Amino acid sequence: MTDASADALTSPSNSGASQDTSQQNAVVLLSGGLDSVTCLYWAKARYAKVTAVSFNYGQRHNSELVAAKSIAGQAGVNHKIIDIDIAQLGGSSLTDHDMTVPDGDADKFPTHTDDIDNQAIPNTYVPARNTIFLSYALAVAEVTDANHIVIGVSSVDYSGYPDCRPEYIEAFEVMANLATKAGVTGHKLHIQTPLQKLSKAQTIQLGNSLGVDYSQTISCYKADSEGRACGICDSCTLRKRGFSDAGLADPTRYAG
């Protein structure tokens, strides 16, 4: 395991978080993909009670929800699937079937959020998705007495989405503590991003050390009804490169 992966395993991801979280609760955003499942297992190793939250938002790759449900069950955590019809808004190839999901190109991905201004944001970006998801997770956190919300964003190997940047996460955390009963009564909420500084390979190494079975995860933007990946979209391209760079066999089921 790399030093960065080891640090993510042993340290809280945000400096403002309490060092001792073993008696605290967490909410994990769980899509069923590689990053979010790694976050689920990371959270299970840290918090007393973990609630996983997934969203049925009209995504074309909704087989990821089947994976999320199965993985949450195996992990032994409470799992909520929330229905939100983001698809009616359009604006993303992940929700609009009239738009084409582009093929991936490993050479074009930003390697740090500083590069985002020089990159075209791909049409797989879903407008305001992380803001919507985090807002629902915030409500679940208040109901379940959770002090932590865990989300699998990264600013190293990523597709260039603006709502994956650390400054966005920091701003949301400020808002969360201004806008909630928990925040104003002294029960500070923390947005945890354990993968923020990890490459895809480092994320995979971290998950491997935590016992994640990546064969059950679905990352593909065009996964079929059986969860088989296309192998060529942005997400598949990053995932393939991650396993290769990590020196581990890729357990992904590919179509064809």
From Swiss-Prot:
Q: What InterPro entries has UniProt attached to this entry?
A: QueC, Rossmann-like_a/b/a_fold
Any one GO MF annotation of this record: ligase activity, forming carbon-nitrogen bonds
Compositional bias per record (Polar residues), positions renumbered to this chain: 8-22
The enzyme's first-digit EC class, named in words, is ligase
Is the Metal-binding keyword given for this protein? Answer: yes
The cofactor named in the record is: Zn(2+)
User: Which E.C. number(s) belong to this protein?
Assistant: 6.3.4.20
Q: How is the cofactor bound?
A: Binds 1 zinc ion per subunit.
- Residues reported to bind Zn(2+): 220, 230, 233, 236
Similarity remark: Belongs to the QueC family.
Q: HAMAP family in the record, alphabetically? A: QueC
Q: What is this protein called?
A: 7-cyano-7-deazaguanine synthase
Q: Which organism is the protein's source?
A: Psychrobacter sp. (strain PRwf-1)
